[in-house]
Amino acid sequence: MATSTTRPPTGEERDQRPLDIQAMRAGAHRLLAEDPKPSVEELGTVALRLREHIVLAVPEVEEMAGRLPHDDTRRACARACIGEARMRMRLKPGATPAARIARAQRLARSVNALCDHYENLDGS
């Protein structure tokens, strides 16, 4: 059986492909807006996409925050956001449609917050 030699992208490789903040925010907005929510059938796909956005954004924000001084407020806020996003990634889907929507909305809020930190730290 072959073993995988896949490795996470280096910082330089990630810099070559910046996050698509606009697409990430659009996906989050779909669950946070007053518009009709996705159907129960679509919700799993939407939640999976939000989780993928978080997986991509966390290392980027973590790296940018890590460049700041240890006592910088922006660093502390970004690290708290990362911790919250990781915690939300561990949440299990609920048994009811309302619980599944609530979980997906929490993921969407984390995506938005990570996008905010990505944009704010990029100008550092």
Give the residues covered by each predicted segment:
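General structural signal for alpha-helix termini and helix-helix connectors
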Residues: A33-K37, E63-H70, M87, L91-A95
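Short, well-structured hydrophobic secondary-structure segments
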Residues: V40-P59
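Amphipathic, well-ordered alpha-helical segments in soluble domains
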Residues: M24-G27, H53, A57, C81, ...
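Short intrinsically disordered terminal tails
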Residues: M1-T5, L121-S124
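Amphipathic alpha-helical binding modules
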Residues: A80-S124
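Short, solvent-exposed, charged loop/turn and helix-capping segments
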Residues: L56-A76
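Short terminal alpha-helical segments
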Residues: A2-V46
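Short, charged, amphipathic alpha-helical segments
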Residues: G44-L48, D72-R79, A98-Q105
